[in-house]
A protein has these predicted regions:
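Active-site neighborhood of phospho(di)ester-bond hydrolases with catalytic His/Asp-centered motifs
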Residues: 31-33, 60-69, 76, 89-91, ...
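Pre-active-site segment of Zn-dependent metallo-hydrolases
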Residues: 11-13, 23-86, 90-128, 194-201, ...
Length: 477
């Protein structure tokens, strides 16, 4: 029975997103091809086999990328190695950012051979198809089968999209600008952003969906309001500065780092002259984050109205006087050594966001053992990652393993949920409620069991109270 959806990752967890939509036995579409992280990595397999594409690629007509986070595109090199040569469809900003992410991923997990990397990136760029938002693109148009796709802004990171797929098995040869009422529409949410994500407009719901594949990362909770999270961040900065300590923030290079810089610029801008915060230095110690921040500046045509208003006032939300970047590895080591001895408070942003690697690890090794420092998490911490362990055991004075060694946690540990670039439970429900025609089937993906179960209960109650039946809400597997 078609259409049929097969999940190759990101169904029962929050990493490794990869979904295959089958139109018939010979034609399919792949949505994302992400890397597994944390406990979702199969440690029983050799390292290279964990990433091998274990499904046939011959039927895949295209790969559509919802956004360029590594848990959504990290297996792309292995997909191409498996023989996929079809179009890689993404939004204009994602087309700009994707080669940067893939280059970094290749250097970390595949090879540092420049010639091989350049050859691979050339192949990726040859396959990239840039699809503007809101524009239908015909993927298949043949006798007995017509498929078209459209991207809409998802508000998660710059370039993020949710995907509308119109599938019709009688090939009506309709105009691509018209809706086909007899077609079946499948929507893949990708990662949906919160309504107040800095720099990005809030996502708007689709007109209709017959089947909705919906993320559920925060399906069991509500985020703090933007004003509350900003006040909490400001309070933590003041607390650290009063103690002569540093604020250490593990953050994704793409999206989260830029959101934090945007918020920090505003906090410093509005601070009273002569206040401690006016003298706060902000360090971004991540070459990839620095590259992406520059790309975000270049892609300002995609910013939201608030960001443009600040820019027109002469402010530079992603490039302000108090901001410094650390480039080379030697400079990084010198910075860690200097700051570990310094009493002048600094806010440090470095990857990785779950503290599972990258330069943040050296800062944590140097500073977790001192109570004057603050460690602040602003994003989801997958089970099995050092970030999750620090959050869990830090308040108890426990320890965490970093690079195989135990480090006692004396620093204060905090989490601000409001900085999540993911929609919360209310936002996810509103995404459906604001459709003109609600889905007949909702498949919940990209969430742990607790989050998916809680969201399933909410949707079933919503359908029961609004239209008299539970709806078909499925926990994908």
């Amino acid at each position: 029975m078609y259409p049929k959806i097969e999940h190759h990752g990101g169904a029962q967890g929050v990493t490794g997103s990869c979904h295959q939509l089958w139109f018939d036995s010979e034609h399919s579409l792949l949505v994302d091809c992400g890397l597994f992280q944390g406990q979702e990595v199969d440690d029983s397999l050799p390292a290279l086999e964990r990433l091998t594409i274990d499904f046939p690629t011959e039927t895949i007509q295209a790969l559509i990328v919802t956004h360029v986070h590594i848990d959504h595109i990290g297996r792309l090199p292995y997909l191409l190695a498996a023989g996929f040569r079809g179009p890689i469809i993404c939004s204009p900003p994602s087309a700009h950012l994707l080669p940067l992410v893939i280059e970094d991923a290749l250097k970390i997990g595949f090879t540092r051979n420049k010639s091989l990397i350049e050859r691979f990136l050339k192949q990726v760029k040859q396959q990239l198809v840039v699809l503007p938002y809101k524009q239908w693109h015909s993927l298949i148009d043949q006798k007995g089968l017509a498929v078209k796709v459209r991207l809409q802004r998802a508000g998660h990171i710059l370039g993020s999209a949710y995907i509308e797929v119109d599938f019709n098995d009688v090939s009506p040869q309709d105009s691509l600008t018209d809706d086909v009422t007899e077609s079946k529409r499948i929507v893949f949410s990708g990662d949906l952003g919160a309504p107040w994500t800095p720099l990005l407009p809030a996502p708007r719901s689709p007109y209709r969906a017959d089947i909705l594949v919906l993320e559920s990362t925060y399906g069991d909770r509500l985020h703090q309001h933007r004003r509350e999270r900003s006040q909490q961040l400001e309070h933590l900065i003041e607390q650290a500065m009063a103690c002569g300590g540093h604020i250490i923030i593990p953050a994704f290079s793409i999206g989260r780092t830029q959101e934090l810089l945007y918020e920090l610029e505003h906090i410093i801008h509005r601070a009273e002259p002569g206040s401690m915060i006016k003298s706060l230095e902000v360090i971004v110690d991540s070459p990839l984050a620095a590259k992406f921040t520059q790309s975000y500046r270049e892609l300002k045509d995609w910013w939201d109205k608030e960001a443009w208003r600040r820019y027109r006032q002469g402010r530079h939300p992603l490039s302000f006087d108090e901001l410094y970047t650390v480039d080379g590895h030697d400079e990084h080591l010198q910075t860690v050594d200097y700051l570990s001895r310094s009493q002048r408070s600094t806010l440090i942003i470095a990857a990785s966001g779950m503290a599972s690697g990258g330069r943040i690890v050296n800062y944590l090794k140097a500073m977790l053992g001192e109570s004057r420092h603050q460690v602040l998490f602003t994003g989801y911490q997958a089970k099995g990652t050092p970030g999750a362990d620090i959050l869990r055991y830090g308040p108890q004075g426990g320890w965490v393993k970093l690079d195989g060694e135990k480090y006692t946690i004396q620093a204060s540990v905090h989490q601000i949920s409001g900085y999540s670039a993911h929609a919360d439970q209310k936002d996810l429900i509103n995404f459906v409620k604001r459709m003109r025609y609600w889905p007949q089937e909702i498949r919940l993906v990209h969430g742990d069991d607790q989050a998916r179960e809680a969201l399933k209960d909410q949707f079933e109650q919503l359908y029961r109270e609004s239209i008299g039946f539970d709806g078909q809400v499925i926990l994908a597997n």
